[in-house]
Amino acid sequence: MLKAIMVPLDNTTDSERRIAAAVTAAQKFEAHVLGVHVIPTIEHMMQTIPYMPYSVDILQDQQHILKTTAMALWDNFESSMTHAGLLFDRYQEEGDVQSYLKLYSRCADLTIINQNAGGKFPIVDDMTSFMLESGLPVLAIPEQSAYPTIGKRILVAWKDSAQCGRAVHDALPFLQMADEVIVLSVGEYDRKAVPAADICLHLARHGVTVEAAQGDIGDTPAEVILYAAENMNADLIVAGAWGHSRVTEMIMGGVTKSLLSNQRLPVFFSH
């Protein structure tokens, strides 16, 4: 069961979306919410946007704005948690954003992040790196204003790999509470691999209402996953985060990257 959910905070509409998703997930599991706000140092700002024509004075002004608007940020977070009847803690740090978020993610069962959106500087500036290095599950949410349900109908993207096995195990709290779960085999049939039917049997022993399905091998894995998820009206995809190396990511056809930017459905990733 999920008992602690971490949500990174900043002064953006993306932060409001993360809070909304955290509320939905926390109410589902009666979980504690950890709000984490990290104000980047000038040095970190310069590393994050090295090719932008910003002077130190401009960056100092930006840092000052972040500090002075922090109170409004916390008011919004606390109001959302209180209105939802949730228990919460708040943490504010100053330093390297990515490092602090990885640190606090290890004190939670799940971290809420945004899916990639072209042209934006996300609070987690390298989501794949964040997932691989934090070592704990994340919920990557699309650009929408509300998340009325997360995990009522779930598609599990299955491929016989350590990453997918870990994702299924970590997602058990969601899977056990779902009304419908489909385990979709992605890729060509491999007689030496663990089939989706066996994973379904394993999940059924945990009380999951589940069935197996086979994806169309004619399309890319990401397209197969998204089509099947939308066809069953899923509100969550569970997937292993593939990305040991650039070579591995190329071999997998960029599945993780594609799902991280699908902007249609929340994705539960684990590695």
For each predicted feature, which ranges?
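Small/aliphatic-rich secondary-structure junction motif
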Residues: 1-56, 133-136, 150-215, 234
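Structural beta-alpha unit
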Residues: 40, 75-111, 206-237, 243-250, ...
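A short acidic, glycine-rich active-site loop
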Residues: 55-71
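Hydrophobic alpha-helical segments and helix pairs
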Residues: 85-143
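Structural alpha-helical scaffold elements that stabilize or flank donor/cofactor-binding regions
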Residues: 101-104, 130, 174, 230, ...
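Glycine-rich, Arg-bearing micro-motifs that act as flexible, cationic patches
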Residues: 113-130, 239-262
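Short, flexible loop segments at boundaries between secondary-structure elements
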Residues: 148, 262-271
